Amino acid sequence: MTAQDLSVHIARWLDSLPLQAGSKLVLAYSGGVDSEVLAYGLSEYAKQRPDLRYQLIYVHHGLSPNADNWAKHCQARAAIYGLPVTVERVQLILGPRVSVEAEARKARYQAILPHLNPQDILLTAHHEDDQLETILLALKRGQGPKGLAAMGQIQPLSLADKGSCLQVRPLLDISREMIETFAQTRQLVHIEDESNQDDKYDRNFLRLEIIPRLKARWPSIATTASRSAQLCAEQQAIVETEVSERLPKLLVKAPVTEQTVLKLSELAAQPIEWQGILLRGFIESQEFSLPSYVQLQQMLQQLIHAKEDAKVHIRINDCVLRRFAGMLYLDSGETLSTALHITARDLHQEILTLLTQASAMVEDKIVPFALVTTGPRLRLPKADEVVSLGYGLPGQFRCQPHFRDKGRELKKLWQECAVPPWLRAEVGFLFYNDKLVMAFGLWVEKAFCAQGDEIGLSYLIANP
């Protein structure tokens, strides 16, 4: 391909996408030579497809004294291209051991994502040399096939609650030299970020010091490295397919919380090379950041090989891993207040309203209460009974659940009902006057069960 063909190449790429009338093509636009070329190609394509919507987004990081001028450059160029442009200003949160590159990239995506819907396409101007940088960085970090697969030309991009859209890199198989030649031929004006010359940043070091020497020795190394990345991506796809078949067999719903947990005995029974892969798959399926290889090995050692009564509590990135009753629980580590909460109102006529309000104290979920005439259920309060809600009862508190003939201390019932220690302070208890009548999700006190076909209140999850 010659530089003259580059705009045709961009148009063909865009034509291959699942575009529909009203879809929006959004370009992450920095004003650098790569995104300038892609912005030009997008403007040419817009003449062919006026039924689509277009948007350029420049993210102002505030890191350079030239950033305001760059924003003005992008606005001026967008006017020449006849494309709408948005300037998004972000503020980076920096500190010790925080990567400026990583934080800037994170901030860019956070600024751009609100502009996207599932039918839209995000375009980024990564090229073949960027791909080589990504592969070399993955090697430096000791990553496996997933990391070495680097960037795909088409990848899904999560939009959180809105679903996902596609992220497309039309220039990923185009060399930096070809992009620069095209820009010169079309006399495209672009900015030069002075920070690109600072080799304290890993990508700049590779771009300035390493890749030129590699290409001088092996001119096609960026192309062949991209081929290796594609092969790694294919291998990773096979692994992920296998994980999608194996992992569900290791998962169950936990008592009380009904969250998905991993059966550690089943994980330990897997071939050793699959244990780490499946654990990573479980963490990823719960939408937490993935651990490093070293962290993963340490986690496996503690989760599988520690003594059965050992307390396992591991914090990795944004995830807390806990072992209880042979199960692996994952959560964000953000717990509710463990202080005693009591609400009391004389509203026997409004008990369902009370309990719905109280549900705000139970993991911010709507508590699944129901009025039923069968099964274990709580009789409704009498006219002279005050309903109250409590948390954090002492372990010596004596209870008699509907499924027991005799009373038992709460600390024993926690174990019997398989309630993890870190969740016990968050289980709500319902009282009529000063008498315990229900433990949410666990039991109804035997003396307060509805009788015969009498209507009663049910909120039971665990089945001891």
From Swiss-Prot:
One GO term describing the cellular component: cytoplasm
One Pfam family of this chain: ATP_bind_3
Disulfide bond residue pairs: none
EC number(s) from the headed UniProt entry: 6.3.4.19
Gene3D superfamilies: 1.20.59.20, HUPs
InterPro entries: Lysidine-tRNA-synth_C, Rossmann-like_a/b/a_fold, TilS/TtcA_N, tRNA_Ile_lys_synt, tRNA_Ile_lys_synt_N, tRNA_Ile_lys_synt_subst-bd
Family: Belongs to the tRNA(Ile)-lysidine synthase family.
Protein name, UniProt field: tRNA(Ile)-lysidine synthase
Species of provenance: Shewanella oneidensis (strain ATCC 700550 / JCM 31522 / CIP 106686 / LMG 19005 / NCIMB 14063 / MR-1)
Native organism taxonomy: Bacteria, Pseudomonadati, Pseudomonadota, Gammaproteobacteria, Alteromonadales
